[in-house]
Amino acid sequence: MKNETDFMVQLMRVKGDLAPFAKVEYVDQDAKTHSALMVVDSCSCHNILIGARAEQHGVVWQAEEGTMNIGGAGNEMVTTRLAKFHFTLGSKQFHEPFCIKDGDIDIPSEIGGTPIIGILGNLFMQQYRLAIDYNDYTLHTSNVSPENLRISDCDFFFPMEIGLERYGLPVLAIRQNGTDVVVLADSGATSNIIASQTIKDGGFDCQILGTTDTIAGIAGGTEVKDAMVKFCLLTLTEDDTDVVHHEDIFKVSQHYLMTPEQGKCDKDGVQLPPVVGLIGSPFMAKEKWVLDFGVKYIYKKNLTA
């Protein structure tokens, strides 16, 4: 598949829950074919199967030796078992490594009668050079290159490789009063999140809306409040950098998603800045971004040019 350019599947966009879902098919031990959904999650490094759900719906996997610790940003790590799972996505067959998560995950158990059994992570998308395209809600093989995607043709452009190399996750930069803070570009998230300390330190124009909620990751939850926040996303230009002004609702958390104390360092051992929040799928869908794991760019084409 790495040499093919015609792979494309339609992603399911659910009203009120704008994380993208991909439909996969697989065969159970009795050779019966099943369909299920997986979240297409840019901020999960690994593919994940929700063990009990997968077993309930006839998934057969091949157990591998060893375990792996995984976790959402800011949450405690969870130990998972390792396996390989054979499935079909669109017209392509895959036999891929998965982490088997015991217990449940705070995502719906099904949509329209189709079960949700797991997550496709960014290592899968990097391996097969896939792009999450919010223009037409598809997952497809990267169809751009550094030569045919000019920065001048984009209303927004940020190199995904920076985050993938340093954090293992795609990141963005919010510039506030001359200072840049790091946030994740998280297709699996249904809300924007930002730490209250960042709001305070940066002097953001922020209106607390008063709504209190709890958001949950793979290993835990945290209490948040809704706020309308004005913010500027750093974007590359042909000459230097610029900012794009936005205003959107964020869930304000008491915690960073990834703190310096968690020991994230670059390849030279220098401690990385904390991850103070994330931009979720509803915002990216509204902006019609493309998260392209082939060329490792996040961009929004200027459709009026």
Spans of features found by a protein language model:
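Pepsin/retropepsin-fold aspartyl endopeptidases
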Residues: 1-305
